[in-house]
Curated annotation (Swiss-Prot):
Contains 2 disulfide bonds that can be either 'C1-C3, C2-C4' or 'C1-C4, C2-C3', since these disulfide connectivities have been observed for conotoxins with cysteine framework V (for examples, see AC P0DQQ7 and AC P81755). Belongs to the conotoxin T superfamily. Keywords: Amidation, Cleavage on pair of basic residues, Disulfide bond, Neurotoxin, Secreted, Signal, Toxin. It holds the Pfam family Chi-conotoxin. One of its GO terms (molecular function) is toxin activity. The modification Tryptophan amide is found at residue 62. It comes from Conus pennaceus (Feathered cone). It comes from the Eukaryota. This is Conotoxin PnMRCL-0111. Residues 1-19 form the signal peptide.
Length: 63
């Protein structure tokens, strides 16, 4: 029965904790949107090269 007040206090402390990460960002903390943007840029570049290779003979980087 003595554990119940301690448990309630711990629950109140957890609930009142900040909802964000208080650690400073490092170089390794890259947002997921950055990876998504890189993927879109790569796909767009590959599609542009493919369309260029179909239309113009001297445009294709690999011949």
């Amino acid at each position: 029965m003595r554990c119940l007040p301690v448990f309630i206090v711990l629950l109140l402390l957890i609930v009142s904790a900040p909802g964000f990460d208080a650690r400073p960002k490092t170089e390794d903390d890259v947002p997921l949107s950055s990876f998504h943007d890189d993927l879109q840029r790569t796909v767009r570049t590959l599609l542009d090269i493919r369309m260029c290779c179909l239309g113009t003979s001297g445009c294709c980087p690999w011949g």
